[in-house]
Amino acid sequence: MNCKEYIEHIRDELKGSMSYYWKAKEAKKDNDTEAFKYFSKLAVDEYEHAGVLFKMLDEHIKKKTADDKYEGVYKDLYEMSIEVLREEYKETEDLIKKA
């Protein structure tokens, strides 16, 4: 995978996690214990997978920053994208902890 693919995959995982979080919250409101457990587990799984992908992306960038094509503007753009993702990841983590 390249940086763009990692970023897209992480964003998809975070979106999935949030979707499952809201379903779990709705199930809790409806007193559906089984659905709550099911969706909560899926939300955490997606969130944890995003964390694994972050680590892989960091390693990928460390290897690629030595290449000229990743210097300058491209590197800056990837770093900005990653910072936005880190904020989304933190927001997801905070919501999951509250559930």
Where are these regions (language model features)?
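Non-heme di-metal
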Residues: 1-99
